[in-house]
Amino acid sequence: MIEVVCNDRLGKKVRVKCNTDDTIGDLKKLIAAQTGTRWNKIVLKKWYTIFKDHVSLGDYEIHDGMNLELYYQ
């Protein structure tokens, strides 16, 4: 079980607990449950890498305590 921190730079910082074998789509659904936005409107980035929904967190090497950028489309 890892904890990922997502910051939208607008004052909202979300901490989500998930597993490394969860997909980015699963992570978006957990974030959407906490923020109240729709999961398909969320874009997760790290620097210039946009994370795709079907790839797992372990494949992207997302570890415990990692910060991700949260954008809305």
Curated annotation (Swiss-Prot):
Gene Ontology BP terms: mRNA splicing, via spliceosome; positive regulation of protein targeting to mitochondrion; protein modification process
SUPFAM superfamilies: Ubiquitin-like
Keywords assigned: Cytoplasm, Nucleus, Ubl conjugation pathway
Localization per record: Cytoplasm; Nucleus; Nucleus, Cajal body
Nucleus found in the keyword field: yes
Start and end residues of each Ubiquitin-like domain: 1-73
Protein name per the record: Ubiquitin-like protein 5
Organism for this UniProt entry: Homo sapiens
Gene name, Swiss-Prot/TrEMBL: UBL5
